[in-house]
Amino acid sequence: MLSASQRSQSVQTTQPIPPENAAAAQSVSACERRFEHPHRLMLGLYLGAFLGMLSETSMNIALPALCDEFGITTGTAQWMVVGYMLAIGIVLPCVGLLLKWVKAKTLVIVALCCFLVGAVVSAASPVFALVLAGRILQGVGTGIVLPSMYAAIMRVFPPAQIGAANGVAGLVIMFAPVIGPTLAGLLIGMFSWRAIFALFAVVSVAAIACTAVFFVTPIETTRPRIDVISVVASVIGFGCLVAGVSLVSDMGASGVVIGLLVVGVLVLAFYVWRQLHLESPLLDLKILGLRSFTVPALMVTCSFACTLAIMYIAPQELQRGLGFDATTAGLLMLAGGVVNAICSFGAGRLFDRFGAVPLVRLGALLAIVGSVLFLMIGVGTVPAFFVLAHVVFMIGIPFMQQSAQSAALKGLPHHFAADGSTILNTMQQVVGAVGTAIATCLLMAGQAAGTAGESAAQGFVTGSRHGYIFGLVLIVIALLLSFLHREQR
């Protein structure tokens, strides 16, 4: 809305507007005024996205402390990671629909409030179940904020500035994994794991304030029909599948686990069938029939799942296997995070010049070397060797992931762009959750098999190697998939 002085000046300096053009002119005027400082307008969303990625990458280093305080197993503690990613994966497909029903500003503030409440609950909870409940609330908030940020960028910035705006958003998101493990380690060393959630709460309040003051709703609410059956099926299907895989580490091949897996697979099969037959599906899964999208999307998913699995195991191995405290473990992971951010920034420019295939293969080879170095880590390994393995691995991953992601989205027709991005992000989060759960199962199985006659530290190192082998297999799969991809010039 225009202020009183602005309305007065408008009346004095403009000619009468024809009635049929009044609404359009008013809308254009509002847009010009509102979007005069687009980065300031987006500040709350930038903070929210940073917070979501910081939360996703900083919790791994706190898992040993949670196990010690609550007396839980590694398999139970993994839910702090898996539950968060599962919540994101379930919410993501629904955000596009929510933005058409609820004003973007309202939706983002609600999402950030969910994150704030979740952070406070996790920080203050005396029992693990409530810590996990707060963590899942944080995942819901992140799952809404991330796609909302990119949707707002497409409408707030003029076409000539969208590339630069996406670059700013990318830098914000890349900065979080760089400092996440190190910051979490420092907070645990100085205070406790609860300080991590206290920090999340403070940043949440800042993001809410910036959104309330600066953000406007750039997305029109059209209120299309909601296919409730699809929404429910996606929640049940993804939830049962990830829960079933995650419970294997503690319950084995029990009836509950098998039942969850069967229900998850059947419901997801129904979900896919329904999306393919609806006139207005929740997600247009016909995109998966495009080889130019599906092959690089699978490469992205494999590399993302590998990264999460290895980054889930590595900080725990530093503490439980090599005997470092949380602060030292966080500092040892800083170099790899910095290198990853730098390479992520450069991978996009190299993609424009060389295409996806050579970069994916180069990245896969580097990641394979890094994974093999991880396999060579033992109880007496010097810190410098771990840093070397981590740095080599983290150099390779962005060349794989960024290049394959660009290739997947580049060849999509314009009308598939939004669904393609959502499908890709959903695949990453859900498969990442499953991959982390599988890595946990392998970690615990290897730990149990190698404990006889070994110290607890050696047993954890033995179990970690099983998880690293799983990550190595995923990288090899991504490398083989690169031979099926055809570049689009």
Predicted regions and their residues:
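Cytosolic juxtamembrane N-terminal segment immediately preceding the first transmembrane helix
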Residues: 1-54, 68
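Peri-membrane helix termini and adjoining interfacial loops of integral membrane proteins
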Residues: 18-22, 207, 446-455
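12-transmembrane solute porter fold
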Residues: 38-63, 70-89, 94-96, 100-108, ...
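Cytoplasmic helix-loop-helix junction between adjacent transmembrane helices
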Residues: 137-171
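Membrane-interface helix caps and helix-loop-helix hairpins in membrane proteins
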Residues: 128, 219-224, 247-253, 379-380
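C-terminal membrane-cytosol helix-exit motif in multi-pass small-molecule transporters
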Residues: 201-220, 235-247, 263-278, 478-486
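Membrane-embedded alpha-helical segments in integral membrane proteins
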Residues: 56, 60, 64, 117-122, ...
